[in-house]
């Protein structure tokens, strides 16, 4: 299931709930103050958050996720079945991550 759109029509928290049973890469760009960001997802989990092709450490990933959750401008595309090329994993439960940051 390929999915694309803008954060003004579907905020990230809604988007993550729609995608909670999917595996793939959620690419987000045109968010003020952030470079293009990729969230790698697997069912029920945020596997990794990457910028410029590199995984972010947990504290930086939390800050970026919080900024993305607040963003109401930006574009996204979900690419199913893509996995990160690196072995760094956050492996955060999606709903727990949303509840702890919102």
Predicted regions and their residues:
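Acidic, Ser/Thr/Pro-enriched low-complexity segments and adjacent helix/loop capping patches
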Residues: 1-102
């Amino acid at each position: 299931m390929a999915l694309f759109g803008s954060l003004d029509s579907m905020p990230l928290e809604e988007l993550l709930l729609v995608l909670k049973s999917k595996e793939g890469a959620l690419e987000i760009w045109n968010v003020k103050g952030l470079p293009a960001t990729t969230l790698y997802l697997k069912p029920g989990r945020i596997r990794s958050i990457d910028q410029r092709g590199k995984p972010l450490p947990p504290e930086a990933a939390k800050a970026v996720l919080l900024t993305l959750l607040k963003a109401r401008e930006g574009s996204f595309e979900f690419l199913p079945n893509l996995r990160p090329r690196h072995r760094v994993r956050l492996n955060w439960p999606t709903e727990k991550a949303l509840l702890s940051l919102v």
